[in-house]
Amino acid sequence: YDLLPYLPALAGEVIGSAEASDRFLDDWRLTLGELITDNLYGQVGRIAHEQGLTTYFEAMENSRPFVGDGLAPKCKADIPMAAMWARTQTLNFTQKMFLEMQADLMESASTAHVFGRKQVAAESFTAYGPSQGDSLVYGLYPAMLKRIADLEFACGVNRIVIHESAHQPIDSMVPGLSLDIYGMWFNRLSTWAEQARGWTDYMARSSYMLQ
């Protein structure tokens, strides 16, 4: 149908009737979602495959949803991906931010089940630095992070992608360089780096068994 007469509905005007306006707005949002899915995620996937690359699409996360079906962009990925931050709000399993991220994990797992993907990835343990006022900062350690990893596994994730491990060229610059304000700060200068093997083995073995 002709789009032009209904455009004022985007500014809150009722065109024809409330029902007709709502139906137009539903069509509008659905179309935007389809265009973004096909022309961004679909196109990137096609180009990547032409170059023999595997795609991970961390589409929408918890607080950046665009209009459309959440599974649609993720199904364009070879490995659908979610995110789970290591923040004070997410370590408290009742906080709204935690619940939103849990939904993102489960949405990615659902995408894998519906579209036949064998792996579900998650950007894991992302944290803010001091400038954002999070009290955790460099205080994150494996016993604390295990709660998040176990939650990811329980929600269907089977490939943990640790965020982040910046290159550390200067031994004396402790606790090390970072990705701007973002952690967690997983590198050889961490105070528990030499004791990390049990933790990394746990994540690797759990991921392998779940895959």
Where are these regions (language model features)?
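Carbohydrate-binding surfaces of carbohydrate-active enzymes
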Residues: Y1-P80, W85-Q211
